């Protein structure tokens, strides 16, 4: 009841240690290796199912995985959406970057991949998969 809900313990549901999703979430919110999860699960689907089954559960998943079995949480009054992720106003998000060996020029094939990955065609594929494309 201290956080506005029923008088019941909050059940924190997360991914297993070593999960990229868990590492990303914990680093974004600044709690690396400090969370104590009631349930540590091995898939996004399992996290969503556990949260959907318990009104006192709280978990984290990728925006692209959210369906109508769970409710997204607003952060600082901002709802999660493609637009709020792209403009940076939804604070719980993680960017991905391309990397290559330091001091080396990209090969023609690697440059072709980067060109495609940053193209409108790739953005359409990314959006079609339910993820947030480049802004």
Question: Where would I find each of the regions flagged by the language model?
Answer:
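Exported/periplasmic ABC-transporter solute-binding proteins
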Residues: 1-135
